[in-house]
Curated annotation (Swiss-Prot):
InterPro entries: FN_type2_dom, FN_type2_sf, Kringle-like, SP_Capacitation_Regulator. This is Binder of sperm protein homolog 2. Residues 35-79, 80-128 form the Fibronectin type-II domain. It comes from Mus musculus (Mouse). The gene is Bsph2. Epididymis. SUPFAM superfamilies: Kringle-like. Disulfide bonds join C40-C64, C54-C77, C85-C111, C99-C126. It is found in: Secreted. Residues 1-22 form the signal peptide. Gene3D superfamilies: Fibronectin, type II, collagen-binding. Belongs to the seminal plasma protein family.
Amino acid sequence: MEVMSHLVHWVFLAVYMYELNAELISHLHPPEQEISTDSCVFPFVYADGFHYSCISLHSDYDWCSLDFQFQGRWRYCTAQDPPKCIFPFQFKQKLIKKCTKEGYILNRSWCSLTENYNQDGKWKQCSPNNF
């Protein structure tokens, strides 16, 4: 318990000295959270953008908002959380039948959330099991 007390003091000191965003710190070392049975809301608005799937923005783990406009209510995502990839989907002049790295500047696998990515532009990163 003493170690946790010291950690809390260091975090508060870092926030004070470096004016760090407390929201960033809370996501990096999240507090114990009760398991939420509330459903993720897709799309949701966070950090001036629409998100159509779980995100890891400001966090080490994927999470989602429980409200359309993020208001601080969130939960960690699971493999059962929607939305699912849609296969096949249209990307540029190709019909894509599985997760692809094509066109992603970070060279990560992604998929479309609709049958026509060119038209809708809705996508998510693929998980190891292509959920």
